[in-house]
Amino acid sequence: MEPVSHQGMPRLSWIDTLYSNFNYGTDGYDAEGNEEHKSSREGSETMPYIDESPTMSPQLSARSQDSVDGVSPTPTEVLLPGGESESDKGLLMRKLVLSGVLASEEIYINQLEALLLPMKPLKATASTSQPVLTLQQINDIFYKIEDIYQMHKDFYDKLCPIVLQFDNKTTVGHLFQKLASQLGVYKAFVDNYKFALETAEKCSQCNVQFFKISEDLKVKGPKDSKEQPQSVTMEALLYKPIDRVTRSTLVLHDLLKHTPTDHPDYPLLQDALRISQNFLSSINEDIDPRRTAVTTPKGEPRQLVKDGFLVELSENSRKLRHLFLFTDLLLCAKLKKTTVGKHQQYDCKWYIPLADLVFPSPEESEPIPQLHATPDHEIEEMKAKISVLKSEIQKERKSNKGSSRTIERLKKKMFEYESWLLLYSPTIPFRIHNKNGKSYFFLLSSDYERSEWREAIQKLQKKDLQALALSPFELQVLTASCFKLRTVHNVPIISHKDDDESPGLYGFLHVIVKSAKGFSHSSNLYCTLEVDSFGYFVSKAKTRVFRDTTEPEWNEEFEIELEGSQCLRILCYEKCYDKSKLNKDNNEIVDKIMGKGQIQLDPQVVQSKNWHDDVIEMNGIKVEFSMKFSSRDMSLKRTPSKKQTGVFGVKISVVTKRERSKVPYIVRQCIEEVEKRGIEEVGIYRISGVATDIQALKASFDANSKDILMMLSDMDINAIAGTLKLYFRELPEPLLTDRLYLAFMEGIALSDPAAKENCMMHLLRSLPDPNLMTFLFLLQHLKRVAEKEPINKMSLHNLATVFGPTLLRPSEVESKGHMNLASDIWSHDVMAQVQVLLYYLQHPPISFSELKRSTLYYSTDV
């Protein structure tokens, strides 16, 4: 029996005395494991610290100048004067990031030291007649902690002197690369983590001495700190390596962001990031006790695996829901409306045990509920309104008289518009079915997102799942826990972003999808490309199908327009030709996703003039691609052709005069071919053609090749459509002319229908005859394409969106003014260009002869 004190608790044995007499130094660390600093917070917001937890922002400890093992000064001590060069700014930011790394590493090492401190005394007692723990229990609890401590101690000791003598020639990439290569030790720790917690808990229940030790571990702080060591539990410290490794990529992203691409560190940091990301993807399923809700029927912790906002079709209307995927069930909830100041709560709409959840096959699935589709023009009009509000907010911020109340009012309105867009833009169906007979329908914005949810659910279903039924109380507890457990806190809309967050890229992304490897069997393979815009993803391009191969080589180039985009997604499909696998919603054959991946569009990388090569790894498959970005100001430049014998880049009047035609031959032939075999092609004019095919057609038209008709008959129809778009884009001036640009902008803005009709018809009459004849010829063609909208999915508004900004653009003189304004104002102009073309597309047939005979009610000079 253990000796008991007068208070009824066991007296301290020699192990307690040894433990309590240890010299810890000083620190500030609260019981929740959050480091707090009493020193000034000046400059902390400018420093990209790598936090230990969401609520902490560790600063460097103050060191004496003669301290050998000191770290770099705080940000306020190293800020450069206001006139520093770009290289100086980059150097400063790198040093600040690395200083943050050192501060974070010092805290982490101190935590590991505190965790390891009782291990040696415990081992010493293990061989005595009264052991506190057995050697096996000690090894189970402290498994791999020593190895993790040593690798971080070595990293810290080598990084510290480098940061103290930091300049633009300093290299640290090798240290991060080595640290990343040692992450395997974390895998062993993670695999043992749950067992270590269980062992520690059992030992605490059986042994009062160990209970006292595990509840009162002392964590010292940075050297020279005057604060006392803080008490932390063993359970909290055992979680630190889990928390640390899941954040291992953050600092690498920060360093890469502020490291020039030609710096020796850049490839090493990229390699370290790749290793870290691959490692994290292999352990992301492991248990996180902070995301544990309640226990499953088998007594295991129920963990949140995935959550996000989806649009559900319920009672023939769209509802925004928050979907929570736990290890054994799927729960659909809605956020309750609460008054200001009250705690927000979720209301459970339904749940399905994963054991009862099935995905109906295309032939088995019932048709999607009848729902009024939102017209495309309403979606585009809402985007235009959002762009206008964004520009107004920016104007208010720049104005000296801009009031916060006005900005908040504008942001509130923008939130309403974006919420509407998020609710009514998704169109891709996602069905889940309960074995008991109930079906649920969601609408998603991209196939990538649908695949993520399906794969996450199917992965969990491979485990030994048991049927379950939650009692009302259990359901209430689980639903109440969702608010704290959720990982997605806000709907993905712009108004939720901080003011200093990247607005994304505006312009054109050129992507070459080269090849893919890693397929286990020969298949018919193709890829699609998605980019984000206004908070959701849209499919932008599709490669051709490479048949019967394990190593497809597409080598296809696409030009993708970006509207505030920050991410590129690539999906790889196996083409299915089995007509029994039809999607009942649109009679399209459902192809199988073989892999998917995404990459952040880092402006520093993609905005370089050179092509950037990259690889996306997905389910063992590697897709190689290159990309290059061109900004909107570059896309506005129209370079006249040096060879006046061709057609591309040559004035339309010169071409028609040479050909003795009213409409250029290239326009007539491309339109004829599209109407012959492409008018029912899904996404005609919207889906990008292969760049190499388009360039081949361009060269043939420029050379007036005799084989052009043969080429057109053999060429992919999207390449022909792309050639027509390229011709209009490369005209020395847009088809509707530079001179009339502002007049078209003013005309479409008129409110009175009669005045608008007068103005818009007069503007057409003001065009040169070749331009007018070509425009009317194209107009009738686009109307015929739109007549097939039920098949080709191309409405008048879709076609106006594709051709409007090409046929009507500001001159280079006017565009220079646009480049000095916010990208949202430019975007607003694009919407107006779309509206101009849409006006003529929706207008009754316009005859050239009648138009020329007509006169205005009022004579005006444009």
Curated annotation (Swiss-Prot):
Key words, A-Z: Cell projection, GTPase activation, Guanine-nucleotide releasing factor, Synapse
Region described as Disordered: 30-84
GO biological process terms on file: intracellular signal transduction
Protein name (Swiss-Prot/TrEMBL): Active breakpoint cluster region-related protein
Annotated organism of origin: Xenopus tropicalis
InterPro entries xrefs: Abr/Bcr, ABR_PH, C2_dom, C2_domain_sf, DBL_dom_sf, DH_dom, GDS_CDC24_CS, PH-like_dom_sf
Domain DH: 93-286
Domain PH intervals: 303-462
Domains: entry comment: The central Dbl homology (DH) domain functions as a guanine nucleotide exchange factor (GEF) that modulates the GTPases CDC42, RHOA and RAC1. Promotes the conversion of CDC42, RHOA and RAC1 from the GDP-bound to the GTP-bound form. The C-terminus is a Rho-GAP domain which stimulates GTP hydrolysis by RAC1, RAC2 and CDC42. The protein has a unique structure having two opposing regulatory activities toward small GTP-binding proteins.
Chain's gene name: abr
One Gene Ontology molecular-function label: GTPase activator activity
